[in-house]
């Protein structure tokens, strides 16, 4: 199971987060990989507003106490390599949404206004409770729009100061790039393999049963039969058996030089004869 959404009380800062351009310049060989030391920010900005939608009357939304009294019209967005952070500037806390918990993110235009639409899994921070039995996974819909109201300069994060051209479109593009770094945990559970695992399972090779059967009566005469008896039959691959003689024994010549042959058995009287013959050799 992947990481879950949670409440955080420390926003990304210059000590634990670096811009993507700087990270790519200093660590090109690890670009797009998760860093163990610092987070990487790909986008974001100040002066955004979010809205939790309740379009499904068959589901009840329950918000955790920390998010009940916060100002949803004044938030900052941090698009990190690991998650999307929605920081509530007035409450000094944030909602961290790992990309594995974001089912869908898309751009939507309504009355000439473009907003970012998110569909996330139900979590402990914002819970979706179905009124009855359903086959669908409980989810929450969130709308993020650009807030034209000027923000408090004291709330400006140094990581977002350089991103003066922040917009809904740039946030969407940054999320699309970062979400591609992470595998789908649901696909892993269903298939039993990791999306990033190079050792994927190969399809099984179907071998006709008559290829492995010693009885060749039912085999077409034009079809070559390779025997597999386990007696060094792979030493001469070009020697194709088309007769089906099961009494043949595969063998090969081995020059052992002066080495002893393990497993040879000789009688006691043969030892004296062999030693005498060896002494007569000049």
From Swiss-Prot:
It is found in: Cytoplasm; Nucleus. Gene3D superfamilies: Pleckstrin-homology domain (PH domain)/Phosphotyrosine-binding domain (PTB). Coiled coil: none annotated. It holds the Pfam family Voldacs. The keyword Lipoprotein does not apply. It comes from the Eukaryota. Keywords: Cytoplasm, Nucleus. Its main location: cytoplasm. InterPro entries: ICln/Lot5/Saf5, PH-like_dom_sf. One of its GO terms (biological process) is spliceosomal snRNP assembly. GO terms for cellular component: cytosol; pICln-Sm protein complex; spliceosomal complex. The keyword Protease does not apply. Signal peptide: none annotated. Belongs to the LOT5 family. This is Protein LOT5. It comes from Scheffersomyces stipitis (strain ATCC 58785 / CBS 6054 / NBRC 10063 / NRRL Y-11545) (Yeast). The gene is LOT5.
């Amino acid at each position: 199971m992947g990481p879950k959404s949670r409440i955080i009380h420390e926003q990304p800062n210059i000590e634990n987060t670096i811009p993507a351009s700087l990270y790519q310049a200093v660590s090109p060989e690890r670009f797009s990989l998760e860093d163990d030391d610092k987070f990487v920010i790909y986008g974001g900005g100040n002066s955004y507003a979010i809205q939790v939608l309740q379009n499904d009357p068959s589901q009840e939304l329950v918000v955790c106490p920390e998010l009940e009294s916060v100002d949803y019209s004044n938030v900052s967005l941090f698009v990190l390599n690991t998650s999307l952070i929605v920081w509530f500037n007035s409450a000094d806390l944030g909602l961290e949404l790992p990309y594995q918990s974001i089912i869908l993110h898309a751009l939507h235009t309504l009355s000439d206004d473009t907003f970012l639409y998110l569909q996330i899994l139900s979590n402990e921070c914002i819970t979706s409770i179905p009124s009855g039995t359903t086959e669908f996974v409980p989810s929450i819909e969130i709308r993020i729009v650009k807030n034209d109201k000027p923000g408090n300069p004291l709330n400006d994060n140094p990581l977002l100061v350089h991103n003066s051209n922040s917009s809904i479109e740039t946030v969407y593009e940054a999320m699309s790039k970062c979400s591609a770094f992470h595998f789908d945990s649901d696909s892993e559970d269903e298939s039993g393999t990791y999306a990033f695992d190079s050792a994927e399972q190969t399809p099984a090779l179907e071998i006709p049963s008559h290829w492995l059967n010693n009885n060749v009566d039912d085999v077409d005469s034009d079809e070559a039969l390779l025997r597999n008896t386990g007696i060094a039959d792979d030493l001469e691959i070009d020697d194709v058996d088309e007769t089906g003689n099961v009494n043949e024994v595969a063998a090969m010549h081995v020059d052992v030089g002066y080495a002893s042959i393990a497993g040879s058995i000789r009688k006691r009287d043969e030892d004296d004869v062999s030693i005498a013959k060896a002494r007569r050799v000049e």
